[in-house]
Curated annotation (Swiss-Prot):
The keyword Metal-binding applies. Disulfide bonds join 78-189, 206-214. Residues 1-25 form the signal peptide. The lineage of its organism: Eukaryota, Metazoa, Chordata, Craniata, Vertebrata. GO terms for cellular component: extracellular space; nucleus; plasma membrane; secretory granule; trans-Golgi network. Keywords: Disulfide bond, Hormone, Metal-binding, Secreted, Signal, Zinc. InterPro entries: 4_helix_cytokine-like_core, Somatotropin, Somatotropin/Prolactin, Somatotropin_CS. Growth hormone plays an important role in growth control. This is Somatotropin. It comes from Gallus gallus (Chicken). Its main location: secreted. Zn(2+) binds at residues 45, 198. It is found in: Secreted. GO terms for molecular function: growth factor activity; growth hormone receptor binding; hormone activity; metal ion binding; receptor ligand activity.
Length: 216
Protein backbone atom coordinates (compact mmCIF):
# COMPACT_ATOMS: atom_id res chain seq x y z
CA UNK A 1 0.00 0.00 0.00
CA UNK A 2 1.25 3.47 -0.85
CA UNK A 3 2.77 5.72 1.83
CA UNK A 4 0.18 7.84 3.59
CA UNK A 5 -2.58 5.29 3.05
CA UNK A 6 -4.74 3.78 5.77
CA UNK A 7 -3.08 2.05 8.73
CA UNK A 8 -3.30 -1.70 8.19
CA UNK A 9 -5.59 -3.29 10.83
CA UNK A 10 -3.49 -6.47 10.58
CA UNK A 11 -0.27 -4.56 11.24
CA UNK A 12 -1.80 -2.79 14.23
CA UNK A 13 -3.05 -6.12 15.57
CA UNK A 14 0.37 -7.77 15.20
CA UNK A 15 2.17 -4.88 16.87
CA UNK A 16 -0.39 -4.71 19.66
CA UNK A 17 -0.15 -8.43 20.37
CA UNK A 18 3.59 -8.05 20.83
CA UNK A 19 3.21 -5.32 23.47
CA UNK A 20 2.80 -5.77 27.22
CA UNK A 21 -0.82 -5.61 28.36
CA UNK A 22 -0.43 -2.10 29.78
CA UNK A 23 1.16 -0.77 26.60
CA UNK A 24 -1.41 -2.46 24.38
CA UNK A 25 -4.22 -0.82 26.31
CA UNK A 26 -2.77 2.61 25.57
CA UNK A 27 -1.78 1.95 21.93
CA UNK A 28 -2.76 5.15 20.10
CA UNK A 29 -5.54 4.85 17.52
CA UNK A 30 -6.05 7.27 14.65
CA UNK A 31 -8.50 10.02 15.72
CA UNK A 32 -11.95 9.83 14.17
CA UNK A 33 -11.50 13.28 12.62
CA UNK A 34 -8.39 12.03 10.79
CA UNK A 35 -10.21 8.95 9.52
CA UNK A 36 -12.96 11.14 8.08
CA UNK A 37 -10.48 13.64 6.61
CA UNK A 38 -8.52 10.86 4.87
CA UNK A 39 -11.69 9.25 3.52
CA UNK A 40 -12.95 12.56 2.09
CA UNK A 41 -9.61 13.27 0.39
CA UNK A 42 -9.50 9.82 -1.21
CA UNK A 43 -13.11 10.06 -2.38
CA UNK A 44 -12.48 13.52 -3.86
CA UNK A 45 -9.44 12.27 -5.74
CA UNK A 46 -11.23 9.23 -7.14
CA UNK A 47 -14.25 11.29 -8.18
CA UNK A 48 -11.97 13.76 -9.98
CA UNK A 49 -10.17 10.94 -11.80
CA UNK A 50 -13.47 9.37 -12.82
CA UNK A 51 -14.86 12.69 -14.08
CA UNK A 52 -11.73 13.49 -16.09
CA UNK A 53 -11.66 10.02 -17.63
CA UNK A 54 -15.33 10.19 -18.56
CA UNK A 55 -14.79 13.53 -20.32
CA UNK A 56 -11.72 12.25 -22.15
CA UNK A 57 -13.50 9.08 -23.27
CA UNK A 58 -16.45 11.15 -24.46
CA UNK A 59 -14.18 13.54 -26.37
CA UNK A 60 -12.23 10.69 -27.97
CA UNK A 61 -14.95 8.19 -28.87
CA UNK A 62 -18.45 9.71 -28.72
CA UNK A 63 -19.56 12.09 -31.51
CA UNK A 64 -20.96 15.32 -30.11
CA UNK A 65 -24.36 14.86 -31.75
CA UNK A 66 -24.80 11.50 -29.96
CA UNK A 67 -23.82 12.51 -26.43
CA UNK A 68 -27.15 13.78 -25.16
CA UNK A 69 -29.04 10.79 -26.60
CA UNK A 70 -26.60 8.30 -25.11
CA UNK A 71 -26.76 9.91 -21.67
CA UNK A 72 -30.51 9.25 -21.63
CA UNK A 73 -30.33 5.69 -22.98
CA UNK A 74 -30.52 2.38 -21.14
CA UNK A 75 -26.71 2.17 -21.36
CA UNK A 76 -26.53 5.04 -18.87
CA UNK A 77 -28.62 3.21 -16.25
CA UNK A 78 -26.63 2.55 -13.08
CA UNK A 79 -27.16 -0.51 -10.89
CA UNK A 80 -26.62 1.72 -7.88
CA UNK A 81 -30.03 3.23 -8.63
CA UNK A 82 -31.59 -0.06 -7.49
CA UNK A 83 -30.55 0.50 -3.86
CA UNK A 84 -32.16 3.16 -1.63
CA UNK A 85 -29.04 5.32 -1.51
CA UNK A 86 -29.52 9.09 -1.12
CA UNK A 87 -29.27 10.96 -4.41
CA UNK A 88 -27.96 14.26 -3.08
CA UNK A 89 -26.85 16.31 -0.09
CA UNK A 90 -30.36 16.97 1.24
CA UNK A 91 -31.30 13.28 1.09
CA UNK A 92 -28.00 12.31 2.72
CA UNK A 93 -28.70 14.66 5.62
CA UNK A 94 -31.72 12.51 6.50
CA UNK A 95 -29.59 9.37 6.96
CA UNK A 96 -27.46 8.34 9.93
CA UNK A 97 -23.69 8.18 9.62
CA UNK A 98 -23.72 4.38 9.71
CA UNK A 99 -26.32 4.23 6.94
CA UNK A 100 -24.22 6.53 4.77
CA UNK A 101 -21.11 4.45 5.45
CA UNK A 102 -22.96 1.27 4.46
CA UNK A 103 -24.14 2.85 1.21
CA UNK A 104 -20.61 4.11 0.53
CA UNK A 105 -19.11 0.68 1.11
CA UNK A 106 -21.61 -1.01 -1.20
CA UNK A 107 -20.91 1.50 -3.98
CA UNK A 108 -17.13 1.17 -3.65
CA UNK A 109 -17.20 -2.64 -3.58
CA UNK A 110 -19.41 -2.80 -6.68
CA UNK A 111 -16.52 -1.35 -8.73
CA UNK A 112 -13.60 -3.40 -7.42
CA UNK A 113 -13.91 -6.04 -10.15
CA UNK A 114 -14.79 -3.86 -13.19
CA UNK A 115 -11.90 -1.41 -12.71
CA UNK A 116 -9.38 -4.25 -12.95
CA UNK A 117 -10.21 -4.48 -16.66
CA UNK A 118 -9.58 -0.83 -17.49
CA UNK A 119 -5.99 -1.41 -18.64
CA UNK A 120 -7.22 -3.94 -21.22
CA UNK A 121 -9.64 -1.38 -22.60
CA UNK A 122 -7.49 1.76 -22.55
CA UNK A 123 -4.03 0.64 -23.57
CA UNK A 124 -3.01 4.21 -24.45
CA UNK A 125 -3.05 5.28 -20.78
CA UNK A 126 -6.30 7.17 -21.32
CA UNK A 127 -7.59 6.04 -17.95
CA UNK A 128 -5.71 7.12 -14.82
CA UNK A 129 -2.35 5.85 -16.08
CA UNK A 130 -3.11 2.21 -15.19
CA UNK A 131 -6.11 0.39 -13.80
CA UNK A 132 -3.93 -0.95 -10.98
CA UNK A 133 -3.76 2.54 -9.48
CA UNK A 134 -7.54 2.86 -9.58
CA UNK A 135 -8.01 -0.52 -7.94
CA UNK A 136 -5.49 0.33 -5.21
CA UNK A 137 -7.18 3.67 -4.53
CA UNK A 138 -10.59 1.99 -4.32
CA UNK A 139 -9.19 -0.61 -1.91
CA UNK A 140 -7.69 2.20 0.16
CA UNK A 141 -11.06 3.93 0.34
CA UNK A 142 -12.82 0.65 1.13
CA UNK A 143 -10.44 0.07 4.05
CA UNK A 144 -10.95 3.63 5.27
CA UNK A 145 -14.74 3.28 5.23
CA UNK A 146 -14.49 -0.05 7.04
CA UNK A 147 -12.28 1.60 9.68
CA UNK A 148 -14.93 4.29 10.18
CA UNK A 149 -17.64 1.65 10.49
CA UNK A 150 -15.64 -0.17 13.16
CA UNK A 151 -15.30 3.08 15.09
CA UNK A 152 -19.03 3.84 14.92
CA UNK A 153 -20.65 0.40 14.99
CA UNK A 154 -21.05 0.27 18.79
CA UNK A 155 -22.84 3.61 18.80
CA UNK A 156 -25.35 3.00 16.01
CA UNK A 157 -28.02 0.30 15.51
CA UNK A 158 -27.50 -2.04 12.58
CA UNK A 159 -29.68 -1.44 9.55
CA UNK A 160 -30.97 -3.95 6.99
CA UNK A 161 -28.42 -5.80 4.87
CA UNK A 162 -27.91 -4.14 1.48
CA UNK A 163 -27.60 -6.16 -1.69
CA UNK A 164 -24.43 -5.22 -3.53
CA UNK A 165 -25.10 -4.03 -7.10
CA UNK A 166 -23.05 -5.72 -9.79
CA UNK A 167 -21.50 -3.94 -12.76
CA UNK A 168 -20.37 -5.62 -15.96
CA UNK A 169 -16.75 -5.66 -17.02
CA UNK A 170 -15.55 -3.00 -19.43
CA UNK A 171 -15.67 -4.21 -23.04
CA UNK A 172 -12.30 -4.44 -24.80
CA UNK A 173 -13.72 -4.24 -28.36
CA UNK A 174 -13.60 -0.48 -28.82
CA UNK A 175 -14.27 -0.66 -32.58
CA UNK A 176 -17.72 -2.01 -31.82
CA UNK A 177 -20.31 0.74 -31.30
CA UNK A 178 -22.22 -1.27 -28.71
CA UNK A 179 -19.02 -1.76 -26.73
CA UNK A 180 -18.25 1.94 -26.87
CA UNK A 181 -21.69 2.82 -25.56
CA UNK A 182 -21.44 0.19 -22.84
CA UNK A 183 -18.09 1.58 -21.64
CA UNK A 184 -19.44 5.12 -21.89
CA UNK A 185 -22.35 4.15 -19.66
CA UNK A 186 -20.08 2.37 -17.17
CA UNK A 187 -17.78 5.38 -16.89
CA UNK A 188 -20.82 7.59 -16.35
CA UNK A 189 -22.00 5.32 -13.52
CA UNK A 190 -18.50 5.19 -12.02
CA UNK A 191 -18.42 8.99 -11.93
CA UNK A 192 -21.93 9.23 -10.43
CA UNK A 193 -21.28 6.61 -7.76
CA UNK A 194 -18.02 8.20 -6.64
CA UNK A 195 -19.75 11.56 -6.47
CA UNK A 196 -22.32 9.99 -4.15
CA UNK A 197 -19.61 8.53 -1.92
CA UNK A 198 -17.79 11.86 -1.80
CA UNK A 199 -21.04 13.65 -0.88
CA UNK A 200 -21.92 11.16 1.86
CA UNK A 201 -18.47 11.41 3.46
CA UNK A 202 -18.51 15.22 3.34
CA UNK A 203 -21.97 15.32 4.91
CA UNK A 204 -20.79 13.09 7.75
CA UNK A 205 -17.57 15.00 8.30
CA UNK A 206 -19.30 18.38 8.34
CA UNK A 207 -22.10 17.13 10.57
CA UNK A 208 -19.69 15.71 13.13
CA UNK A 209 -16.97 18.33 13.17
CA UNK A 210 -18.81 21.43 11.91
CA UNK A 211 -15.94 23.20 10.17
CA UNK A 212 -16.77 26.83 9.44
CA UNK A 213 -15.46 26.44 5.89
CA UNK A 214 -17.38 23.22 5.26
CA UNK A 215 -18.49 22.89 1.62
CA UNK A 216 -20.31 19.99 -0.02
Amino acid sequence: MAPGSWFSPLLIAVVTLGLPQEAAATFPAMPLSNLFANAVLRAQHLHLLAAETYKEFERTYIPEDQRYTNKNSQAAFCYSETIPAPTGKDDAQQKSDMELLRFSLVLIQSWLTPVQYLSKVFTNNLVFGTSDRVFEKLKDLEEGIQALMRELEDRSPRGPQLLRPTYDKFDIHLRNEDALLKNYGLLSCFKKDLHKVETYLKVMKCRRFGESNCTI
